[in-house]
Amino acid sequence: MHVVVASHHRLPVEGYGGPQRVVVALVRGLAALGHRVTILAQPGTKVVEAAKIVEVAPRLLKDSSANLKKFIPDGADILHAHFPLKQGPKGVPFVQTLHGNWKPETPLPPNTIFLSRDHAKRHGSTIFVHNGLDPAEYIFRGRKEKWDLFLGKLHSDRGYQWAVEAAKRTGRLLIIAGGWRPSFTGSVKYVGEVDGKRKAVLLARARCLWMPAQWDEPFGLPTIEALFSGTPVLGTRRGALPEIVTPAVGVLRDTLDELILAGDKVTTLDPRACRERAERQFTHLVMAENYVRIYQNVLQTGELQ
C-alpha cells in the first residue's frame, strides 16, 4: 500500500512535540511493515530512509484540499492527514487523526480517527487508534531511584501543581522536565525541556512518572514513554489514562490526597510488567497495523469501519 502521511511540521521535531513524534513513529512503522510511504511536511524534514519526503510550505498544507492534491504522488492509495481537513482531495481516499480535543460547536471533520476510546466517545465516535512509539528509543531499567518525575508542558491542565504539592508534603524529590520555568524550591528540581537520550535516562531512573491530568487527555504520550522505561505511572482517572494504566503498571486516583496516600504502592509494581504492557499495546508497529486496518476499510468500503 502507498500511504501519504501529511503533517504541518518539520520532522523530526526539535524538543518535545508529542504529535510530531507520533507521526514519525507511524511513518517508521508503516515502512517496517513493508508499505510505501510518502511524507508531506515542512522543508527540512528528515524522517526515514525508507520514506520519500515531499517538502511543502505550511500555508499550502493548510490552504485547501485542492492545493494538497498537487503534492500527492500519482498512484498513492490513501492520504493520512495529521491536521483537520474540511474535505479530502478530490478522488483521493483519506483519513485524518485528531491529536487534540475538538470544539463542540464546530462540525467534526470527516473521516476522523481519535487517539483513544475515551477521546472518540467524547466526540460521538468509536473509531480510535492508540498512539505508539519505537521501544528502541527508551532505556529499560529495573532498578529505580528514589525521586519522582513530571515530564511535559507546565500547564495547569496537566496537573503539575499536584506533583509539586505532593513533593512538598512528602519531602520526596520531584524532578520537573518541561518547557516553561516557574520558580521552584525545596524538594522540587527543574531541569528544563528535555528530549532524546537525556529524557530516556530520566524516564528510566525515576521511581514513577506523575500524570495528574486535570483535563480529559486525548492520550497522554509520556505515559507510554514511562512504561517503555519500566517506570510506573501515578495519575488521575481522566481521559485516556485508564485505558493505558492498569493496576499492574500504575496507580490512578481522583484526588491529590488519594494519590499521596497510594504513592508508595508504585514501588511494589514490577518494571518488567510496565515494559511488557507497552510492548504489547503501544509500539509503533502495533499503531501502524491498526491504522492499516482502517486504511483497508476506507479503500474497500469508503467508510472508516
Where are these regions (language model features)?
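N-terminal strand-loop element at the rim of the active site
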Residues: 9-11, 28-62
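Donor nucleotide-sugar binding/catalytic pocket of nucleotide-sugar-dependent glycosyltransferases
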Residues: 94-139
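Conserved donor-binding/catalytic core segment of Leloir-type glycosyltransferases
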Residues: 126-175
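Conserved active-site histidine-acidic residue motif and adjacent donor-binding/catalytic loop
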Residues: 180, 188-205, 213-216
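Short alpha-helical segment that forms part of, or immediately flanks, the ligand-binding pocket
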Residues: 200, 223-228, 239-243
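Short hydrophobic beta-strand element within catalytic cores of glycosyltransferases
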Residues: 232-235
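Conserved acidic donor-binding segment of nucleotide-sugar-dependent glycosyltransferases
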Residues: 244-257, 263-268
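A charged, aromatic-enriched C-terminal amphipathic alpha-helix characteristic of glycosyltransferases
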Residues: 267-305
